[in-house]
């Protein structure tokens, strides 16, 4: 059997999508550049609820830069979001679907200028948009700024968030010449430690905050100033263990399975993706075992993204989303009984056969895409995603 060159080849060689994803030894998401814990993940979680927490984003997110006179027009072809109100110094949480209306990815888009859009998020979003950018006649140019899972010397910008009830006061104090008023999901520009930075006003852990970014060479000086002043505000830095739990705090589903693995309509994309791409290396794990991987796909409505689906423009997946607008499943939080959790953990360590599976803390994440069955009286009544 020849070595697969692209994702489509890899799927065929594995005998199907499910076989490929189940056989992969690629584990849960990796957050390079930061230690698992700076103090303890409990204290770090507590800080974004009671004081302020620094969440490092400089190393693990992929960026795609879209430049040109048609940058907005290009993105509007693939994003379900309203785009006619996009102006410089605003951000949007983009929702990207395939032709069948299932989610490919979400990501954050920063409108730096009328002809410059910065896409930041998982590689699935950048891959999807880059593929289509290479097949368009519109006046755009795209460049990638890769994450640091594979080590590299530098990136275009650093990026970190300050989240929690003390975040606003902290940012006001570290701003050299005062903090401009920044509305929700707007971007402001100011100086920290003599360096010009920008900040997107939004929350990631269910609390108010800022996402601050600026030139890579300013990272150490800006972060040092924030940490120095932050000590007075109870600042904690989040390690990778605590960082991975922020989605649960806000109800955001960080990494659902992208709907790109099936269908002739996505075949050319799979043939474009390298076999060793994120999508090609990814694994699926959990108790939800299916023969048809599309059973694991999710729709924007199911993720509470309905308010970001705007039908006043044409985009990929529009007709499918309109057809199933009222038939989506409902996203809820599954809260486990504490006594049951600790009983299962105890039985996984000291009980003789059969032992239970250990529930890893602070998050039970064992694969790239974690999908479990929710059972009631022996019947499956739902499925869970991280």
Predicted regions and their residues:
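Short amphipathic beta-strand starts and helix->beta connectors
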Residues: 44-50, 96-106, 138, 191-200
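Generic hydrophobic, aliphatic-rich segments that mediate packing or membrane embedding
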Residues: 62, 70-75, 92, 103-108, ...
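Conserved, structured C-terminal
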Residues: 1-27, 31, 36, 109-386
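Short coil/turn segments at secondary-structure boundaries
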Residues: 62, 66, 99, 104, ...
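Acidic, proline/glycine-enriched N-terminal capping motif
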Residues: 1-94, 102, 331, 373, ...
């Amino acid at each position: 059997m020849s070595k697969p060159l692209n994702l489509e080849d890899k799927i065929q060689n594995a005998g199907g999508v499910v076989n490929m994803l189940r056989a992969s030894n690629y584990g849960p998401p990796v957050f390079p550049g930061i230690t698992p814990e700076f103090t303890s993940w409990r204290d770090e979680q507590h800080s974004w609820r009671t004081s302020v927490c620094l969440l490092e984003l400089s190393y693990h997110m992929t960026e795609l830069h879209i430049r040109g006179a048609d940058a907005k027009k290009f993105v509007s072809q693939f994003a379900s979001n309203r785009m006619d109100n996009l102006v410089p110094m605003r951000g949007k949480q983009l929702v990207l679907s395939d032709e069948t209306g299932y989610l490919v990815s979400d990501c954050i888009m920063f409108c730096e200028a009328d002809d410059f859009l910065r896409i930041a998020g998982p590689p699935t979003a950048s891959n999807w948009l880059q593929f289509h950018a290479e097949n368009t006649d519109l006046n755009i140019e795209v460049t990638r700024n890769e994450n640091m899972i594979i080590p590299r010397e530098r990136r275009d910008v650093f990026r970190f968030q300050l989240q929690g009830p003390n975040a606003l006061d902290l940012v006001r104090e570290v701003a050299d010449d005062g903090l401009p008023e920044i509305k929700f999901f707007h971007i402001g520009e100011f100086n920290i430690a003599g360096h010009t930075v920008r900040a997107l006003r939004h929350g990631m852990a269910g609390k108010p905050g800022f996402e601050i970014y600026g030139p890579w060479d300013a990272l150490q000086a800006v972060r040092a100033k924030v940490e120095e002043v932050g000590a007075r505000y109870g600042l904690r830095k989040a390690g990778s263990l605590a960082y991975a739990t922020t989605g649960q705090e806000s109800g955001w589903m960080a990494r659902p399975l992208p709907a790109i693995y099936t269908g002739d309509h996505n075949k050319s994309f799979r043939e474009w993706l390298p076999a060793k791409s994120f999508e090609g290396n990814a694994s699926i794990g959990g108790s939800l075992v299916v023969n048809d991987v599309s059973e694991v796909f999710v729709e924007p409505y199911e993720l509470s993204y309905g308010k970001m689906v705007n039908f006043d423009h044409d985009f990929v997946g529009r007709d499918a989303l309109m057809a199933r607008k009222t038939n989506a499943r409902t996203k809820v939080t599954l809260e486990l009984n504490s006594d049951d959790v600790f009983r299962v953990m105890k039985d996984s360590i000291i009980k003789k056969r059969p032992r239970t599976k250990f529930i890893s803390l602070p998050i039970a994440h064992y694969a790239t895409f974690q999908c479990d069955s929710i059972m009631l009286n022996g019947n499956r009544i739902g499925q869970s995603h991280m």
